[in-house]
Swiss-Prot record:
Belongs to the TRAFAC class translation factor GTPase superfamily. Classic translation factor GTPase family. IF-2 subfamily. The keyword Ribosomal protein does not apply. It is found in: Cytoplasm. InterPro entries: EF-G-like_DII, IF2_II, IF2_N, P-loop_NTPase, Small_GTP-bd, T_Tr_GTP-bd_dom, TF_IF2_bacterial-like, TIF_IF2. Residues 479-483 are annotated as: G2. PANTHER family: TR-TYPE G DOMAIN-CONTAINING PROTEIN, TRANSLATION INITIATION FACTOR IF-2-RELATED. Residues 554-557 are annotated as: G4. Residues 58-250, 301-324 are annotated as: Disordered. This is Translation initiation factor IF-2. Residues 186-211 have a biased composition (Pro residues). The keyword Protein biosynthesis applies.
Length: 946
């Protein structure tokens, strides 16, 4: 069965003049028992909607008075009636002059006047008193005598008359009259039916075969024996009688009514014009029982006849398919072909039509994936539910979620069951970044890249300043380098590119990156300090990268310098000096006096010649990111080292998950350049984001290709993060249980460059202990912004700024949010300060420190003050801010604080041993002579992080 929505039912009610809002209609349906209706979009079955429509219509609209038939076997004809005025009949009307009454008013209705029976045969007519309309049925029910019937032949009869002989028609009068209806056939006597009071204005019809006598025309003789009747008003032939529907009982033959029909031209011009039906048209109505909740009603069956379908004709099977159950029931009750009374007729719907499933072509049922694909993406491509795929994977023994990544083999098994084929589609980066064969004829000599490494404060930057004849070290915070610096220096031996790496232990990653991109490593060791931990780390990084090491023993100008001891220590790490028969060049130098610097440059040039450092400047540029940062007004800035080709302004490049077009380039002196050859460092502007230091960069044909490569790398990185969820093991659960009570310090790290941000984050994470952990919520490059403050406020974190400052008004916002901002310029200061913050999370240890004792000698009760214990200090000192224990018979009976301390009459802070004083104890008034007062103080001890 079809359904109907609630808002459609509201529109149907609105057409009947009942306006209800959606909420009111839903509440009304709930009151009628349709609790499944939730909103105006809910649906109801057709029979339910029809029943609800009928009920609401019955409640909101007044029911019209039902037209009930007076009895079977008669025709009801509705006319416009007028009520003639009451006229008193004269005693002896003259036969020659007929009387004419004045025309009655149209508003007055005709009321029959019941007449009383006269005892004499020919009495004089007496005027009957005027009675109301309600008295007419009572008078009609009285049994009239034969004399009364003769006197009043036109009186209305409530009971059907007995069949009688046909009465001859009256003589024709002068005025033309309408044709009279044919006489009805005799019928057997019917049982009497109770009469009902007729409505106001109702005029009863004459009995069959009898008509009331009409007044004779002027000059016609009156009929003998007929009673005098009130004269009827003249009828204007130009006035049409009102047309109305006539009800016809099907068991009786129809009585045609002749009416004036409009001319043919008018009917052709307006064939279906709205308004009353054409005059002369006969409508056939049938009285049928009403539907649920309704009374009997008249049904127009003439339309069925015109269509050639008779009432009671069985409904065909095709028609029955388009009808609801209630519609079929109503058609069966009325014994006729069903015609909808209200609403539009529904178009029959085709039942049994199967949904046609459009299958994809074979070439479209191939799924091309790379290394993996998520369950949700696979379900969307195949058009199946993700839950079905997850259920199948669970049957295969794989517990996955909708966003989990599955490999190509597993996806092929799932796709095969649904008629799909999986093909691995590898993203070939070589298509966008092709490898060019080395052309020996195009190779040119490039400058060597030299990385200066060593321990902190061993003079690396000072040595570079001496080579560059600059003073970079004086401008560094704390005199230490905290990010990689790239410089190109012109020497008598040719251009050399130097990379200055930090020596602090936190910058291990920077040193490793420096070792990867360099050709030579200059290991700086202080002659007075010797080999240190970061020196050893630098040696390991250089050996791992396979780079030649030159050792510069610095600070030989100091009195405590011992170059031989340094050379001896380096032999432990397989670095043997040439003077001792080894292969490692070791030179004593001094950055202050510039001793040994020319010899160092000569050895660097010699090593570069041995290595034969050459590159092709005509190919697309490629290299490595040395450092990256985010500057206000300039955006992401990357310091790159060009290893191959020539980098030009306008080139499209890609590095990691970022891409862009080179907008500008600047060298280490801040000068803008248009192109940079191999072996030179440069700052690049125009990337989409801050790249990761150490990533490679490549120049591609256009920015579109760069974007595709970057998006591919970002997708692989996201898949790796989603697929890198480690399953919980028993060891992990035990480790989590051990650290369940551990305090955690949340941090938001912002630094000036990407390398520093990485180094600071790693250093702070290493500061975590078993008692307090460190969690980095966010680590980024740039100034501290409002977003960082909101992130810290949400995570209850501390913001750590390294060589960066907050933007304007950010400190006020942080103060309002209760966020602490710590700014540092030196990394070890940041680590020490964060350790203090970590210790502040631990609960302090409360330790009791004894101060002294006093013996109660006498007790004083002072009004409005309380009890005062006159005591003598026997040990130590008694302080007013201390705590006190009252001991009696070696038992502590009270513990509290000292409320007052006086010496004689003066308030004092403390009383030393051997003096007497008055002590008041807060909250205790039962001090007795001989009690001992032990005075002590509580001090908080910060616990250790270890």
């Amino acid at each position: 069965m079809s359904k109907k929505r609630v808002h459609e039912l509201g529109k149907q009610l609105k057409e009947q003049g009942i306006e209800l809002s959606n909420q009111e209609l839903v509440e009304k349906l709930h009151a009628l028992g349709y609790l499944e209706v939730k909103s105006h979009s809910s649906s109801l079955e057709d029979d339910q909607a029809h029943a609800a429509y009928e009920k609401i219509l019955a409640e909101r609209k007044p029911k019209p008075a039902p037209v009930r038939p007076s009895g079977p076997g008669f025709v009801v004809r509705k006319r416009a009636h007028v009520e003639p005025p009451t006229v008193t009949a004269p005693a002896a009307p003259p036969p020659a002059e007929p009387e004419y009454a004045e025309p009655p008013q149209a508003e007055q209705a005709y009321e029959p006047e019941p007449q009383e029976a006269q005892p004499e045969a020919a009495p004089e007519p007496v005027a009957a008193p005027e009675q109301p309309a309600e008295a007419a049925p009572l008078a009609a029910q009285a049994a009239p005598s034969p004399g009364a019937e003769a006197a009043a032949p036109a009186a209305p009869q409530a009971q059907p008359a007995q069949p009688a002989a046909p009465v001859a028609p009256p003589a024709p009068s002068a005025q033309p009259s309408a044709p009279q209806p044919a006489a009805a056939q005799p019928r057997p006597p019917q049982p009497p039916m109770p009469s009902r009071p007729p409505p106001a204005g109702y005029r009863p019809a004459p009995p069959p075969g009898a008509r009331p006598p009409m007044s004779a025309a002027p000059g016609a003789p009156a009929q003998p024996g007929a009673a005098a009747q009130p004269p009827r008003p003249p009828v204007d032939p130009r006035t049409l009688r009102p047309t109305s529907t006539q009800a016809v009982v099907i068991s009786r033959p129809l009585v045609p009514v002749r009416r004036v029909t409009p001319p043919t031209s008018a009917r052709q011009q307006f064939p279906v014009a709205p308004g009353p039906r054409a005059l002369g048209e006969v409508r056939e109505l049938k009285v049928v029982p009403g539907s649920l909740g309704r009374e009997r009603e008249f049904i127009d069956v003439s339309r069925d006849k015109r269509r050639g379908r008779q009432p009671g004709r069985p409904i065909s099977e095709e028609q029955a398919k388009s009808l609801s159950g209630k519609e079929l029931l109503q058609a069966a009750i009325s014994d006729r072909a069903y015609i909808p009374i209200r609403g539009k007729k529904k178009k029959p719907t085709k039942k049994g039509a199967k949904t046609q499933i459009t299958e994809k072509a074979e070439h479209k049922k191939v799924i091309r994936i790379e290394e993996s694909i998520s369950v949700s993406e696979l379900s969307q491509v195949m058009g199946v539910k993700a839950s079905d795929l997850i259920r199948k994977l669970m049957q295969m023994g794989k517990m996955v979620t909708i966003n989990a990544q599955i490999d190509a083999d597993t996806a092929a098994i799932l796709a095969l069951e649904h008629g799909y084929t999986v093909e691995k589609k590898g993203f070939e980066v070589e298509e966008f970044i092709p490898e060019v064969e080395v052309d020996e004829s195009k190779l040119v000599i490039r400058p060597p890249v030299v990385t200066v490494m060593g321990h902190v404060d061993h003079g690396k930057t000072s040595l570079l300043d001496a080579i560059r004849q600059a003073d970079v070290a004086a401008g560094e915070a704390g005199g230490i380098t905290q990010h990689i610096g790239a410089y190109s220096v012109n020497t008598p031996q040719g251009p050399i590119t130097f990379l200055d790496t930090p020596g602090h232990e936190a910058f291990t990653a920077m040193r490793q990156r420096g070792a990867q991109v360099t050709d030579l490593v200059v290991l700086v060791v202080a002659a007075d300090d010797g080999v240190m931990p970061q020196t050893v780390e630098s040696i390991k990084a250089a050996k791992a990268a396979g780079v030649t090491i030159l050792v510069a023993i610095n600070k030989v100008d100091k009195p405590q310098a011992a170059p031989e001891r340094v050379m001896q220590q380096l032999t432990e790490y397989e670095l043997v000096a040439e003077q001792w028969g080894g292969t490692t060049i070791m030179l004593p130098v001094s950055a202050r006096t510039k001793q040994g610097i020319p010899e160092l440059l000569e050895y660097i040039a010699l090593q570069s010649e041995v290595l034969e450092l050459k590159a092709n400047p005509d190919k697309l540029a490629a290299g490595r990111v040395i450092e990256a940062k985010l500057e206000k007004g300039r955006g992401p800035v990357a310091t790159v080292l060009v290893e191959e080709g020539t980098l030009r302004v306008g080139d499209a490049l890609v590095t990691g998950v970022h891409f862009g077009r080179v907008r500008a380039m600047m060298n280490e002196r801040g000068e803008q350049v248009d192109n940079v050859g191999p072996g030179y460092p440069v700052e690049v502007l125009g990337l989409s984001g801050v790249p990761v230091a150490g990533d490679e960069f490549d120049v591609v044909e256009d920015e579109k290709a760069a974007k595709e490569v970057a998006q591919h790398r970002a997708t692989k990185q996201r898949q790796k993060e989603l697929g890198g969820v480690k399953k919980a093991t028993l060891e992990d659960l035990f480790a989590k249980a051990k650290t369940s009570g551990q305090k955690v310090l949340n941090l938001v790290v912002k630094a000036d460059v990407q390398g520093s941000s990485e180094a600071v984050s790693q250093a702070l994470e290493k500061a975590a202990t078993k008692k307090v952990g460190v969690k980095i919520l966010e680590s980024a490059v740039g100034a501290i912004t409002k977003s960082d403050v909101l992130t810290a406020a949400a995570g209850n974190a501390v913001i750590v700024g390294f060589n960066t400052k907050p933007e304007s008004e950010i400190e006020n916002i942080a103060s309002q949010q209760g966020v602490k901002i710590l700014m540092f310029g030196i990394i070890y200061e940041a680590v020490d300060r964060i350790r203090e913050e970590m210790a502040g999370l631990l609960e302090p240890i409360i330790k009791e420190k004894p101060l002294g004792k006093a013996e109660v000698r006498q007790v004083f009760n002072i009004p409005r003050v309380g009890q005062i214990a006159g005591s003598a200090v026997t040990e130590g000192v008694v302080k007013r801010a201390g705590h006190v224990r009252v001991v009696r018979d070696r038992k502590v009976i009270f513990t509290g604080k000292i409320g007052s301390l006086k010496r004689v009459k003066d308030d004092v802070r403390e009383v030393a041993q051997g003096f007497e004083c008055g002590i008041g104890v807060d909250g205790f008034s039962d001090v007795k002579q001989g009690d001992i007062l032990e005075v002590y103080e509580l001090e908080e001890i910060r616990p250790s992080l270890d």
